[in-house]
A protein has these predicted regions:
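Contiguous, well-folded functional domains in the mature portion of proteins
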Residues: 1-168
Length: 168
């Protein structure tokens, strides 16, 4: 699932859209060492302004009813035929929230298009019961040799580029 070695076609690019509206923040600011140290891969976090989260790219969603705050999206043909896998987390440690903080809008195995709603989150519950509302977006699988340019500004869900990936 997390294999990182594949051959890539040269001069191929892909753009990931922001899954939420808000300021883009370095993963190092996320209060979870797994993400802050980029153990799962490179990425950026979003400080969401509202509770709508959308797909950052076209692909197939993997999620679980027990973890409605985590969405893996796998795209088979994003960089020269090599897959990408992106993990979108809603909040940090949001699985600890006792009240239902995240309502899924997609099912496991469903095909999604970039900008399609994934879930709606209650940010007030997350603020009260999770470590943070900062929502990591991690590139967990990408072809070897991919240059990743991450965004650093304010983003609008489904329209602002979060990251640009380029074959080197």
């Amino acid at each position: 699932m997390f294999k990182r070695t594949r051959t890539l076609n040269r001069n191929t690019t892909a753009t990931l859209l922001s899954p939420a509206s808000g300021d883009l923040v370095s993963l190092s600011k996320v209060p979870d060492l797994l993400h802050a140290r980029r153990v799962l891969g490179p990425g950026v976090a979003v400080a969401p302004e509202d509770g709508l989260f959308v797909a950052p790219l076209d692909g197939v969603v993997r999620t679980s009813p027990r973890t409605p705050h985590a969405y893996w999206i796998r795209s088979e043909d994003t960089l020269g035929g090599s897959p990408l896998e992106i993990l979108v987390l809603v909040g940090t440690d949001s699985c600890r929230a006792q009240a239902p903080a995240v309502i899924p809008l997609v099912a496991d195995g469903q095909r999604v298009t970039a900008g399609q709603p994934l879930c709606r989150a209650d940010l007030e519950i997350l603020e009260a019961q999770a470590s943070s509302t900062l929502s990591p977006v991690v590139i967990t699988v990408c072809p070897e040799g991919t240059a990743i340019n991450l965004g650093t500004a304010h983003a609008t869900a489904g329209s602002t580029p979060l990251a640009r990936l380029t074959a080197t």
